[in-house]
Regions:
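Glycine-rich phosphate-binding loop of ATP-dependent small-molecule kinases
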Residues: 1-214
């Protein structure tokens, strides 16, 4: 079972990807993890990626696809995998499909976790991080015992720049411009399934399981 998780930043697709991977005993693959693993191991692809990352540049699509295809070719992916955070654009999706076709593979599902922008801005605006140990909380969903104070180390909590409404809005604009077209792409491919991401985490997971089959 080969699955792509789609959804805006903060929609909760990463959480669901981990839950799917655990239930179906298939790897949860994110491009960030692939980059880190290849750079740490000093692979040829990792060295190439590092030259871009060190300069603060985006890793070119061609190289990202090579890294992803190399990862999904590994033994632990023979029964399937969940791709989280890739592809992000139509060119990436086309390049991935082409590379998989050459291996005699194709994606089975693209699951879009659909959450309205205003919900995401509200959700992410409620996140807080500890200045001391980095532990994360949420004012509504995972509050601290004492308001504004970390349960773990007692230091103060802050709203990270990444979670400020103006930053989230910019990220959502980029998502709608670059990634939203993938909805049409995978609809045309006949593999898109859209789920309501505003429901409880466990309800959402159950809805995804019903699509994938127990």
């Amino acid at each position: 079972m080969k699955i792509i998780m789609l959804g805006a930043p903060g929609a909760g697709k990463g959480t669901q990807a981990k839950k799917i991977a655990a239930k179906y005993e298939i790897p949860h693959i994110s491009t960030g993890d692939i980059f880190r693993a290849n750079i740490k191991e000093g692979t040829e692809l990792g060295k190439k990626a590092k030259t871009y990352i060190d300069q603060g540049l985006l890793v070119p699509d061609e190289l990202v696809v090579d890294l992803v295809v190399d990862r999904v070719n590994q033994e632990d992916c023979k029964n399937g995998y969940v791709l989280d955070g890739f592809p992000r654009t139509i060119p990436q999706a086309e390049a991935l499909d082409k590379a998989l076709a050459e291996l005699g593979q194709k994606m089975d599902y693209a699951i879009d976790v659909d959450v309205p922008d205003e919900n995401i801005i509200h959700r992410m605006g409620g996140r807080r991080a500890c200045v001391g140990c980095g532990a994360t909380y949420h004012l509504e969903y995972a509050p601290t015992k004492v308001e504004g104070i970390c349960d773990v180390c007692g230091k103060e909590l802050i709203l990270r720049d990444d979670d400020k409404p103006e930053t989230v809005k910019k990220r959502l604009d980029v998502y709608h411009e670059q990634t939203q077209p993938l909805i049409d792409y995978y609809t045309n491919a006949g593999i898109l399934k859209t789920v309501d991401g505003t429901v409880d985490i466990d309800v959402l997971f159950q809805n995804i399981v019903e699509i994938l089959g127990a």
